[in-house]
């Protein structure tokens, strides 16, 4: 009788373990969970770093509605910048949001799109960068940039699609 009870207990424990694993209820320490728990460290520029990169002669900025004017030491407007956040909140690439800063010249034509801090995979980001993807909007007005169809980058589709959507999200607010 003791052997039968012991056998039933072992069978129940085994069945419980199988059922728990099948429903994703196990310890979380398995290689599967460890791989999914690893999120790349944030890469990309802060908004302030992106502004400084786009406008090396910048000495000050001044918020003007959705636009931020970038000025030199003599308070002359060098151009403008916009941050896709909060308009792009919720737009996700492969590993999360892909916020951008868009730089404009003094006549409000795009001079650059800069990816801000994000958690995308560095290899995908390099692939997007190497294609010249961020230059797609250069020279365009807001209106023309909103109409331009930009293709995603093969092999980095989620990342490039989310950048396109982030660009469009903020441009639509201007």
Predicted regions and their residues:
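Flexible, solvent-exposed loop/hinge segments and secondary-structure transition points
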Residues: 21-161, 165-174
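Bacterial N-terminal signal peptides
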Residues: 7-16
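Positively charged n-region of N-terminal signal peptides that target proteins for export
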Residues: 1-4
